[in-house]
A protein has these predicted regions:
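Beta-rich carbohydrate-recognition and catalytic domains
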Residues: 1-146, 151-209, 218-274, 284-331
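Extracellular glycan/ECM-engagement signal in secreted proteins
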Residues: 279
Length: 354
């Protein structure tokens, strides 16, 4: 059997999308390839402090804001099936995201979905996930379900989502504590909840000892790949961090790490100095390239930090031997990212999958 080596590299050092005034953050991107959109453009959804924004691009690099799709919402995920677009997001009360930065304000959220046939007009919202189990809630910080990710499993649909909260002192706000699953026979639900998390923080885990963060899962070559941003304390830097961990699973429930260390983490300086957060990932079978949009933070505390969106690329190479580290540049994908992708930042992180 052939072995797949995945060579990960940043598209560029700088972000491709920055927050616009007055919001200090633009976060949690989810995107569609142009061939899957009626207008032939790339579409990307992300949130600022006011709600979920939609952006358009001709090349996947240069983006323009189209509109605010949902107010008082965050952490979107876009899913397409048979001509219908499903936009999932975490919904909260008016201005609650701003008030949550102050002490003694409990959080409360649920996950909604809206549908569209043309990415222009959207249906009324439908609630699909609410906090039900004890591990969805925290007596001190509130009730939270967030970071939806829908994957089709045969005739069923599996919703991965984050639940509950853990306070991160140097950030001054909470992050998701667990990751869990619900299943349904329709993208609109009703969903049956798993009674336990599938991923939780572990004090012995150097890259996930504070919170499980979020996960995006995709099916690839008969297995399921997971991209988790674990929340952890860095004892060397004496601060919290977040980094993207690369996982795999046979059943989509029991995950193991492909790489023992993160494939993408904070740099200690620049726009992604402190935290690399949630991402969205899609794979081009024709070009053998993973495209991963992520958001990152420059400073921990909410009064100082800003978040922007970057691009990470994984090129797949197959070999029948162990091989050596690739030095090849990524070639230009058709109908995806234009010529600069072949000039991606040369630093490479290698992943192996047998």
């Amino acid at each position: 059997m052939n072995k797949q080596n995945i060579y990960w590299q940043l598209y560029q050092d700088d972000p491709i999308l920055k927050p616009g005034f007055p919001s200090p953050v633009l976060a949690d991107p989810s995107f569609l390839f142009p061939e899957n959109c009626p207008d032939g453009h790339w579409h990307l959804f992300a949130h600022n402090i006011f709600g979920v924004q939609e952006f358009l691009s001709e090349d996947g690099i240069h983006w323009k804001k189209r509109k605010t799709v949902v107010w008082n919402a965050m952490r979107p995920f876009i899913f397409l099936e048979e001509g219908t677009y499903y936009l999932y997001y975490e919904k909260y009360k008016f201005l609650h995201v701003l008030m949550s930065w102050f002490p003694y304000r409990k959080w409360k959220s649920h996950i909604e979905v809206r549908t569209s046939k043309d990415l222009k007009s959207w249906s009324s919202p439908k609630t699909v996930i609410t906090p039900k189990f004890p591990f969805h809630k925290d007596s001190k910080y509130g009730e939270s379900v967030s970071n939806p990710c829908l994957v089709k499993f045969g005739e069923k649909y599996r919703m991965y989502f984050s639940s509950s909260l853990v306070f991160i002192p140097d950030c001054g706000f909470c992050e998701p504590k667990h990751i869990t699953v619900a299943e349904a026979s329709s993208p609109l639900g009703p969903f049956s909840y798993f009674s336990d998390p599938i991923l939780s923080p572990n004090e012995m885990d150097p890259f996930c000892n504070l919170g499980a963060g979020s996960i995006k899962v995709i099916e690839w070559k008969g297995r399921y790949l997971g991209f988790q941003n674990g929340i952890f304390w860095n004892p060397v830097r004496k601060e919290s961090c977040s980094a993207i961990l690369f996982l795999q699973s046979e059943d989509g429930i029991n995950f193991e790490r492909i790489n023992h260390t993160p494939i993408l983490g904070p740099t200690g300086r620049g726009w992604k100095a402190s935290h690399v957060y949630a991402c969205d990932v899609k794979y081009s079978e024709k070009e053998k390239i993973f495209i991963l949009y992520f958001n990152a933070r420059n400073k921990a505390h909410w009064t100082q930090g800003k978040e922007a969106i970057g691009l990470f690329v994984g090129k797949v190479e197959e070999s029948k031997t162990s091989g050596t580290k690739s030095t090849k540049q990524i070639k230009k994908p058709k109908q995806t990212i234009k010529k600069k992708i072949s000039q991606a930042k040369p630093k490479v992180k290698k992943s192996k999958r047998k």
